[in-house]
């Protein structure tokens, strides 16, 4: 996808900053609990849980905290019920946005999400309004493009769908249910990824070519991600090189 690397790099940078501030811990714990409730408490047989555990470890969460979250999800400790809901809408410039939430108060969550869209000239839409623009898939990113041939052999043999090279990074694409197996194979072969996740990938992008709109989009995304109930934000935004440079 054109522009993937640019947006992926921004997301990766933001994730590191979020981890430093500590706010990502609450979101990871919720994901650990939810993934356990919806599947096996053993990460080896639950790809979603395994991905959540890897995210937790990369954020330097202690194994004891991870264990307690899994036990809570398995019903071995107290914890209130959480609803998982996805909201859809548009930002300025026709940028499509998917907001994944986990909440114990739906009214509070929808109000906060709508406020973030409205504050930065966006619109919260109805179910299905932008979801069709995204496909769920696994993405594993490597920074060393010189390893393309070696990584391709291992990834495709393990069940990867495709590999993209934009000159700055390699993107290994998988089906959601084979993500864990492909990542395990690459890890076992000694290839360390810079980012790996099952995400919602856009089929088309909305190109932003002016800094004013770009800042509105980024501020809206930041505000959404800062909400306690929001687990993840997916968008089809892309930026021209000039705008990207101005964003820093």
Curated annotation (Swiss-Prot):
Domain of life: Bacteria
Presence of the UniProt keyword Coiled coil in the record: no
Subcellular location: Cytoplasm
Gene Ontology molecular function: DNA binding
A Gene Ontology BP annotation from the UniProt entry: regulation of DNA-templated transcription
Family designation: Belongs to the TACO1 family.
Database matches in HAMAP family: Transcrip_reg_TACO1
Protein's UniProt name: Probable transcriptional regulatory protein PsycPRwf_1013
Provenance organism: Psychrobacter sp. (strain PRwf-1)
């Amino acid at each position: 996808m054109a522009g993937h690397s640019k947006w992926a790099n921004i997301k990766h940078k933001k994730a590191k900053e979020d981890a430093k501030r500590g706010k990502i811990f609450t979101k990871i714990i919720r994901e650990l609990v939810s993934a356990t409730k919806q599947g096996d408490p053993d990460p080896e047989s639950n790809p979603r849980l395994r991905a959540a555990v890897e995210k937790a470890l990369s954020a330097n969460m202690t194994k004891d905290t991870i264990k307690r979250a899994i036990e809570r999800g398995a019903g071995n400790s107290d914890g209130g019920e959480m609803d998982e809901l996805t909201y859809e809408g548009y930002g300025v410039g026709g940028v499509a946005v998917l907001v994944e939430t986990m909440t114990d108060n739906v009214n509070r969550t929808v109000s906060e999400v709508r406020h973030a869209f409205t504050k930065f000239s966006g619109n919260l839409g109805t179910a299905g309004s932008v979801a069709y623009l995204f496909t769920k898939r696994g993405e594993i990113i490597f920074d060393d493009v010189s390893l393309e041939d070696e990584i391709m052999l291992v990834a495709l043999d393990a069940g990867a769908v495709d590999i993209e090279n934009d000159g700055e990074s390699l993107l290994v694409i998988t089906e959601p249910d084979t993500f864990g197996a492909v990542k395990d194979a690459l890890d076992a072969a000694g290839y360390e990824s810079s980012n790996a996740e099952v995400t919602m990938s856009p089929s088309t992008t909305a190109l932003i070519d002016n800094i004013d709109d770009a800042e509105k989009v980024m501020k809206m995304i930041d505000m959404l991600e800062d909400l306690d109930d929001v687990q993840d934000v997916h968008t089809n935004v892309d930026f021209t090189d000039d705008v990207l440079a101005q964003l820093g």
